């Protein structure tokens, strides 16, 4: 059935919040290989929904709020911080895989080598799921309790999930020794087993189409705080939200790198573009593969604080 024509359109964005004061947590997510539906198996010892072998890997998804699609002036949202555009075009995986786009899920190419030189292993990648017309209504969470989860998509128009460490996106042949196609599958956690920010299925089918009207916003440097479960980035600025026209809803990916440092941080805004389904490579056959997912682990301990904004946040928003 899908969403009605009047339903706000969905957009996807990925934010890389590059902060060097604390290490990210081991958390939930799916960054790995997509299998044919008939051959999906849970990795031994892994969480529900893990496809094939698994290993700890921080990754998260998120979203924004609903509204009506309206052009947004970039100048209106820019702040006096340095920006660097990095050429990058997110897209549906080119591998010839069954079920790579379904009514509630789709599979993205892994942006390998995209963040080289822009982020370190202590940084975190967030995937933000939002209605594409939510740019004006979305507010960055300021406390842990404010971070939206997937059930809030249809009420608040956004949620956050799937934190990922940049070292999960190395250069080199992603197929080496794996025998499968490396992808990022969105909406795979049907049972929402991977709390607190599960990678829940999307509320309806695509299609996912390109649109040249993409509105870019800046993401400010984030603040970190530690609780007994995870380290959570707390946004102090506005993440990017991209507008896209389509028949039902849209999928967009917008990576943003925010470098943290003493006093201030330079933000790097990467190009975002509507997801599209490119021609399948003829040299590649139909594949199955073991998937790599993040899995909750013991919380990392804070490193020595080099950034004043990181101090005094340990007790704010703790989970009991």
From Swiss-Prot:
It is a single-pass type I membrane protein. Glycans are attached at residue 133. Keywords: Cell membrane, Glycoprotein, Membrane, Signal, Transmembrane, Transmembrane helix. Residues 1-29 form the signal peptide. Its main location: membrane. Residues 273-303 are annotated as: Disordered. One of its GO terms (biological process) is negative regulation of gene expression. Heterodimer with uroplakin-1B (UPK1B). PANTHER family: UROPLAKIN III, UROPLAKIN-3B. This is Uroplakin-3b. It comes from Homo sapiens (Human). The lineage of its organism: Eukaryota, Metazoa, Chordata, Craniata, Vertebrata.
């Amino acid at each position: 059935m899908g969403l009605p024509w009047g339903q706000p359109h969905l957009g996807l964005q990925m934010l890389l919040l590059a902060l060097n004061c604390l290490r990210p947590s081991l958390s939930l997510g799916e960054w790995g290989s997509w299998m044919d539906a008939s051959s999906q198996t849970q990795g031994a010892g892994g969480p529900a929904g893990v496809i094939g072998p698994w290993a700890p890997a921080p990754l998260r998804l998120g979203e924004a709020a609903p509204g009506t699609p309206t052009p947004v002036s970039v100048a209106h949202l820019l702040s006096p911080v340095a920006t660097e555009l990095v050429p990058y075009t997110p897209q549906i995986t080119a591998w010839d895989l069954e079920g790579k786009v379904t009514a509630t899920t789709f599979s993205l190419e892994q942006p390998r080598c995209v963040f080289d030189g822009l982020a370190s292993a202590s940084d975190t990648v967030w995937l933000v799921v939002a209605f594409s017309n939510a740019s004006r209504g979305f507010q960055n969470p300021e406390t842990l309790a404010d971070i939206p989860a997937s059930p809030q998509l249809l009420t608040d128009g956004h949620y956050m999930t799937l934190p990922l460490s940049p070292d999960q996106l190395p250069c080199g042949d992603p197929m080496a020794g794996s025998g499968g196609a490396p992808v990022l599958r969105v909406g795979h956690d049907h049972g929402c087993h991977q709390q607190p920010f599960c990678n829940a299925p999307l509320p309806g089918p695509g299609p996912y189409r390109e649109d040249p009207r993409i509105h870019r916003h800046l993401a400010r440097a984030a603040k970190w705080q530690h609780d007994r479960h995870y380290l959570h980035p707390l946004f102090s600025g506005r993440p990017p939200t991209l507008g896209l026209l389509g028949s039902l809803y849209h999928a967009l990916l917008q990576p943003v790198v925010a470098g943290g440092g003493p006093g201030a941080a330079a933000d790097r805004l990467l190009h975002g573009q509507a997801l599209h389904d490119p021609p399948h490579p003829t040299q590649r056959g139909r594949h199955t593969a073991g998937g790599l997912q993040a899995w909750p682990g013991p919380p990392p301990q804070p490193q020595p604080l080099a950034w004043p904004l990181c101090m005094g946040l340990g007790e704010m928003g703790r989970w009991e």
